[in-house]
Amino acid sequence: FPYQGSSIILESGNVNDYEVVYPRKVTALPKGAVQQKYEDAMQYEFKVNGEPVVLHLEKNKGLFSKDYSEIHYSPDGRRITTHPLVEDHCYYRGHIRNDADSTASISACNGLKGHFKLRGETYLIEPMKISNSEAHAVYKYENVEKEDEAHKMCGVTQNWESYEPIKKASQLIVSTEFQKYMEIVIVVDHSMYTKHKGDSDKIKAWVYEMINTISESYRYLYIDIIVSALEMWSEKDLINVETSAENTLKSFGEWRAKDLIHRISHDNAQLLTATDFDGPTIGLAYVASMCDPKRSVGVVQDHSSVNHLVAITLAHEIAHNLGVHHDKSSCSCGSGYTCIMSPVINSEVIKYFSDCSYIQCREYISKENPPCILNKPLRTDTVSTPVSGNELLEAGKDYD
């Protein structure tokens, strides 16, 4: 990169080696087309390592449910529910033109922010805080100074040594009947609300970026992830959030069954917290529990300033709910890649579920037939690309 040795503080942390780029929009709208604030498809051109690339983006139209709501609380404890218009949102997925293996998950709300894969390397992009400038920083994730080199793990401890897959992934026939739809509620607890200084717009952007990232991973499991609601415990926690991930998970599941499930239509709920769970644990979820009122839940620690790392922890925990276990060494998601269901989170950028996860998810769905994910919900846009999903287990600083 041109600025080797330079250091800059960006949202992901201190970056030692970055490139300044000026993305140029190259999309031409068809004649007579109505100009949306955020088009359905966009292309941007910029240089990476001196070479021009074209980033092709398509809006993630299935991101929000038709009756999407946001909930927060007034100082006197009243619940305030709004139904914001989210049709014209700014969350995209895509690829680099002429690179068959490339992927991208980008928010275009204020400049381009997110990550893309180019020639096997993962890059992050974000706007630079320079007034009246289109300057963006592009950098490899490996050049972000890591906050904490300690291993982080999922708290789920079930093993599947006795598990012998009946079929290889290549033998599973995939048809449209395999497509499933998971409506999810994200609950942000008071510690996370406070960590982000009570800035609800910032919190929403942080959460939406995560869901946009994991929806891409779940496409390969033929599961659509759709956000039904975002609830922020803006005044105080509605459960006792403890440093014990196990106790917090139990309390959250009980609260969902007695409260949340009666006021918001959804299939699964995940709690995001800034509470530092005991030991290396950064997440926890029940295994094979999708659609159960108390157990279709997970808890995830907001453990990194890199959005992608927290997103993958969220994806991991949801997959446990879908009957997916931690990967063994024989599981693979491509040469040299760490997979989402690795029990330990290291400092690599992870994007894919393994062949084992795919088989376990499909077999769980075919055997258990969890009813809540069979219906195709109304969305802000009925056109949607298949998204795959696995169940996730607890996520922790280490995945046990």
From Swiss-Prot:
It is found in: Secreted. CDD domains: ZnMc_adamalysin_II_like (cd04269). Its main location: secreted. Ca(2+) 1 binds at residues 183, 267, 372, 375. One of its GO terms (biological process) is proteolysis. Keywords: Calcium, Disulfide bond, Hemostasis impairing toxin, Hydrolase, Metal-binding, Metalloprotease, Protease, Secreted, Signal, Toxin, Zinc, Zymogen. InterPro entries: MetalloPept_cat_dom_sf, Peptidase_M12B, Peptidase_M12B_N, Reprolysin_adamalysin. It comes from the Eukaryota. Belongs to the venom metalloproteinase (M12B) family. P-I subfamily. It holds the Pfam family Reprolysin. Expressed by the venom gland. SUPFAM superfamilies: Metalloproteases ('zincins'), catalytic domain. The active site is at 317. One of its GO terms (molecular function) is metalloendopeptidase activity. Residues 7-176, 378-400 form a propeptide. Monomer. Snake venom metalloproteinase that impairs hemostasis in the envenomed animal. Zn(2+) binds at residues 316, 320, 326. This is Snake venom metalloproteinase H3. Its cofactor is Zn(2+).
